[in-house]
Amino acid sequence: MQAEIVHSSIENTTFSLALWTPTESDEELLQQWELLATGEQMPPLKASHRRREWLATRLLLHNQGIGRPDVLANGKPVLPQGALSISHCKNSVAVVISDGTIGLDIQEPTEQIFTIRRKFCSSSEWSWLESHAEIVRALTIVWSSKEAIFKYWGQQVDFAAHIEVMPFQCDDPVLDAKYSGVHGERSFRLWHKTMGKLEVVVAL
């Protein structure tokens, strides 16, 4: 498995991130999973890309020494010890592990981000984003930042109303955001890295 591993920290919180873009066929991924003989059965997923996501995620978790995670009612994965977050984008999967609550998102910048801009971007954010030199990439990083914060909380987040991402340059390794909503108010320092074609954001 050619997974890219990152060990990092922000605000005195450490985490371990693994990103994998499998080149194996669906059948090869299934064979690898069956060889592990974990006893866990793949759920009856109709869409082939969902089956591939499930297999790639389980294989990556196993590669990182993580067994089957429990899943809360809101869909958030949890471990008996420590915290876990998972994200998919096209053929890639990433997992992040930390001792504290954490959220992860990965996105590949495309022009399609403009079609959903109003769903996640506030007017104050658009005031500086619309003139950004790398607007598609910048919008993608804002979207990914808000997804990571949503995964941090696990539920009840209005992307445009509850979260504001502060102005940044697209290669900044740390981003700042403010959350104000049903969970109260708090500031986030977000870890950011471009890994291949993907923008990766971790909220701690």
Labelled PLM ranges:
Residues 1-204:
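Core catalytic alpha/beta fold that binds nucleotide/phospho-ligands
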